[in-house]
């Protein structure tokens, strides 16, 4: 019995419930395409939004959306590269291996690679990994190289400055304000300030500028030797102005003030320490350089414009010694005749084939060595005498010259290369060893009671320290003086007083062409440059200075420190904070 074809009735309301017409085959096998077209058209009418989307997407009127084959999303870590450590032997199954005792010790890299991964993805990951490793290597190499280079540069600068040596008075600020201040290039700033002060001002602006400065810092214009303010070309000349001779009368006492300023501290040196402020001290050895074992250049004897062997000069020195009670035979320095007594003109030496023996007359190097041995340690020879000190601060408005505080003989000059911190009272209370750290010039010698020294100390914006009779002294500079650069080579083990004397005449005989070939050395911090004044007087062994005599000065305000030996009955007639002037009595004997 033949089967009847199954027919379906279509309606808009029953489209979704009618089964697929092709499930059991088409009604008319002769028209399969028309039937399929009708079904496709009906499906297309039921989904107008998708049709419009496809038309907009593919710019066509009709598009048949073929079914997509679903592809599972594969995880890249599906095939793990880590696998458990297999048990190779049944007998070792219960024994933990060494891998299990370590972190991730039970894992190992599998031989199976990402064989099913996309080759392009593998290449991309490989390039990313190589780029990351390259950047990591570059960063490591760059940082390491820069660290080594900068460390070497810092070490070189530190060595040239002399910071490689341990300084017990090194600034260790307790606050970031002082640390930032100590890190400033104060020497460079001071040099620039000195150059600015040396710029000549127009005539019309000189007088108003100097009057404004005088009003700010309290300068007394009435005592100026030259009252015409327009005659001072620049600020430097105005700072270093002269005053009338009768403006500073000299007192009759044994010791007078060397400068105008405020008394910061005075007293007796105890245990070789000078009190800066209460609870803060610094060593006298560090201030004067008594124990300095090496110099930046050989010691040389300064030459003067006159002949010390001239009969007039000898008589002048004899009269100076008699008036001021100074013995040129060094008897007063050692307390009479004993095994330790040496007379400057009576020293004899054995010829030890070192070139120092010169018959009956002593060489200057031997005389200086004896003087350096005896003079800095006078307490050993003067049991009834003390070492005293006084510190006087010069403000920017004060008279900037310093004078001789007594009649004495200076035999040695030591120029200490250091910092240029401010010496204002605030920093003296804050920075320990301030006067030891700063650049200074120590004039050492003797007076009728024993050892005597005067130390002008530099400060911030102090262009230079001037000593009138020392033409080779140049402070706050970058390079050392030509005298030291022209001398023979010297190493760090050079003793304080060399076996050989270097006179300025011998050194300056080098021609200009030879000197130009020699490169000037830069000044190194914490080093000393030394000169002797023995050529000033064969009789006194140094340069004689009378009480009240103008010695030199500062280009701006600073500090003067006196360290001297005197009997126990010497008393200061001062008060801390008192204002003193040149020639005013500092103390006397009671």
Curated annotation (Swiss-Prot):
The keyword Transmembrane helix applies. It is an enzyme of class 4 (lyase). Its EC number is 4.1.1.65. Belongs to the phosphatidylserine decarboxylase family. PSD-B subfamily. Eukaryotic type I sub-subfamily. Is synthesized initially as an inactive proenzyme. Formation of the active enzyme involves a self-maturation process in which the active site pyruvoyl group is generated from an internal serine residue via an autocatalytic post-translational modification. Two non-identical subunits are generated from the proenzyme in this reaction, and the pyruvate is formed at the N-terminus of the alpha chain, which is derived from the carboxyl end of the proenzyme. This is Phosphatidylserine decarboxylase proenzyme 1, mitochondrial. Heterodimer of a large membrane-associated beta subunit and a small pyruvoyl-containing alpha subunit. Its cofactor is pyruvate. Residues 160-590 are mitochondrial intermembrane. The modification Pyruvic acid (Ser) is found at residue 558. It holds the Pfam family PS_Dcarbxylase. GO terms for biological process: cellular response to neutral pH; cellular response to starvation; filamentous growth; filamentous growth of a population of unicellular organisms in response to biotic stimulus; filamentous growth of a population of unicellular organisms in response to chemical stimulus; filamentous growth of a population of unicellular organisms in response to neutral pH; filamentous growth of a population of unicellular organisms in response to starvation; lipid droplet formation. It catalyses: a 1,2-diacyl-sn-glycero-3-phospho-L-serine + H(+) = a 1,2-diacyl-sn-glycero-3-phosphoethanolamine + CO2. NCBIfam families: PS_decarb.
